[in-house]
Amino acid sequence: MAPPVRLERPFPSRRFPGLLLAALVLLLSSFSDQCNVPEWLPFARPTNLTDDFEFPIGTYLNYECRPGYSGRPFSIICLKNSVWTSAKDKCKRKSCRNPPDPVNGMAHVIKDIQFRSQIKYSCPKGYRLIGSSSATCIISGNTVIWDNKTPVCDRIICGLPPTIANGDFTSISREYFHYGSVVTYHCNLGSRGKKVFELVGEPSIYCTSKDDQVGIWSGPAPQCIIPNKCTPPNVENGILVSDNRSLFSLNEVVEFRCQPGFGMKGPSHVKCQALNKWEPELPSCSRVCQPPPDVLHAERTQRDKDNFSPGQEVFYSCEPGYDLRGSTYLHCTPQGDWSPAAPRCEVKSCDDFLGQLPNGHVLFPLNLQLGAKVDFVCDEGFQLKGSSASYCVLAGMESLWNSSVPVCERKSCETPPVPVNGMVHVITDIHVGSRINYSCTTGHRLIGHSSAECILSGNTAHWSMKPPICQQIFCPNPPAILNGRHTGTPLGDIPYGKEVSYTCDPHPDRGMTFNLIGESTIRRTSEPHGNGVWSSPAPRCELPVGAGSHDALIVGKFYEVFAEEFCHL
């Protein structure tokens, strides 16, 4: 047998991190041939202490029964399947001694008399219980005992019965009157045994109890009265409006009313008849309910009534915009109260707002009652399309949100203006973050920035650069040639695409004619950098071969001039 392992606290321990640790231990157990910490046993405790969380196969853990339990020390073993052997039935609850019956009473065993069990005590009718009505089997040192002493059942006692004028009572005892004792009244006789008084009322009363604790007499004592007189009538919970005298004469009428909180059933006026009789039959005053409580923002039925009899009901309903919480009706109880508790009317609430706002967020109020407002806010760079808020409103009998979720669209710049003699190239769109490019038509050069970006300043989207200008390309006159001329203007400024023509000068007075060598017409164009150039070199004017004198040759001397210089703007 393996030696016992030192096992620290009874399980579970404060040092075990609860469910998280338990889950981790279960996970680890599936990967190792070990047992986890054994479950905590309510009836036994380990004899040694350990901080280990895992135990090798074959480990023995020793236990002893806890106070309140009996049994021999035992061990549980970690088996090959990583499960501990069962500790069931190793310890049994100790039993308290059989509880004695109280004097004149009984002890009731509810289930058993073992540790933690409870018993009840009771007394028969006519007796009251002195002491505790229950006891529990608890630990005391190494044993178990009942936590309360056995009570006593005392007989319920009544006080002396009431005395009557012109009469007396008879009973088994004139000093001790226990529960159930009966006394009988009789009237005194006159001289020579003559009957001069009439016994009115119940001749016998007995000792009883309403709460099984205090003894009371079953009713009022009778009276011995002179014939053709009536004693004051008694109506429980009633008040005699007429003079309250000891005797009333024949045919005399008295009036009753009920105490507050009670309602009258029967006639309010009765008349004294022969033999101490009151006619008609005396009324009764039964407990009634006052008008039920008013509920804020609610209507109820039977508002015109001042008193309600037991069993009567009133119904509540809430005003539009409110929900009723509690019972819709109350009923008047025999005790003069309303049951159940009055309801309340709470402001209606809308359901949780579940809509989502892509590229934005929803701002919720503290509550969702009628009038609550949910705000919609777009992220930076986006603008709201739709309602900026939704309100909880009343629609018939329902509370609803009055608008749906809007859309957060990306903010856009204004449509960019097209430069004169230029173009705008939108690459994707004109939303914030997008770029556009500018270009000029042929014959024009771009002055300014060739691109712009849609940016955000505060809440406004605008283009980062002003639109450029497309300026027309102008160049000076083409080169002059000897013995020739061109059609350019004296001031120059030849626009793009303009053509100029060359001709040779005639010299008839000298008998010379020049020939134009090259292109007679050249045109204004541009090179890739936007600079103006002529389409070809300027032509030249030459004499025919062998023609003219030496002077003529000088005049017609060959000059090769190229018009390839740039036209800068």
UniProtKB/Swiss-Prot annotation:
SMART domains (alphabetical): CCP
Disulfide bonding pattern of the chain: 35-78, 65-91, 96-137, 123-153, 158-207, 187-224, 230-272, 258-285, 289-332, 318-345, 350-392, 378-408, 413-454, 440-470, 504-541
Record-linked InterPro entries: Compl-Cell_Adhes-Reg, Sushi/SCR/CCP_sf, Sushi_SCR_CCP_dom
Signal peptide interval: 1-32
Keyword Nucleotidyltransferase: no
TM annotation in the entry: none
GO biological process: one example: regulation of complement activation
PROSITE patterns xref list: SUSHI (PS50923)
Tissue: Expressed in fetal liver and to a lesser extent in fetal spleen and thymus. Expression appears to be limited to hematopoietic and fetal lymphoid tissue.
Name of a matching Pfam family: Sushi
Keyword terms, alphabetized: Cytoplasm, Disulfide bond, Glycoprotein, Membrane, Repeat, Secreted, Signal, Sushi
Subcellular localization: Cytoplasm; Membrane; Secreted
Gene Ontology cellular component list: cytoplasm; extracellular space; plasma membrane; receptor complex
Glycosylated residue positions: 48
All copies of domain Sushi, residue ranges: 33-93, 94-155, 156-226, 228-287, 287-347, 348-410, 411-472, 473-543
SUBUNIT field: Interacts with iC4 (methylamine-treated C4) but not for iC3 (methylamine-treated C3).
Family the entry assigns: Belongs to the receptors of complement activation (RCA) family.
Protein name stated in the entry: Complement component receptor 1-like protein
Annotated source species: Homo sapiens
